[in-house]
Amino acid sequence: MKAIVYTTNAGSTEQYAKLLAQKTGLPVYSLAEAKRTLSSGTEIVYLGWIMASTVKGYANAAKRYRICAVCAVGMGQTGTQVDVVRKKNAIPQQIPLFTLQGNFDVEKLHGVYRFMMQMMVKFAGKGLSEKTDRTPEEDDMLDMMLHGGNRVCIENLQAVLDWYKNC
């Protein structure tokens, strides 16, 4: 592996990319920087943010680089939604996929994504708040929707770091 490449919208993915770079010693680039710096076919770890189960930037990165692992950052708890994200993005089974819980602040989102998330919070939040048998994961999601949240932490990267040590 030669580098860490990421796409971010509100900053969580960039935070994870930089934490991972600190722990691995690999250089870190935004996808735009990587296109100017890295050769086509370079082995990378790709980090992207999740929107409707789609890992933003993954398709472009996969066309250009040899992706050794994918880290998808979203609102769900770390380690959840792996099967859905893998299927939606057609990530091959042999490529490790890690989901990481990021931060959530509607005000940090840009453009249409802010509007979409405001609507999601309004409707999904209402449905979750009315649900009487919420799981702990649903309680956490509701809390993030209603109050925002900072969930980026090195502990969420442990499975990624374990994989990296063994590859």
Give the predicted meaning of each segment:
Residues M1-Y29:
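Short, charged N-terminal beta->alpha structural module
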Residues T13, T42-I44, R114-M119:
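Short, mixed-charge, low-aromatic patches
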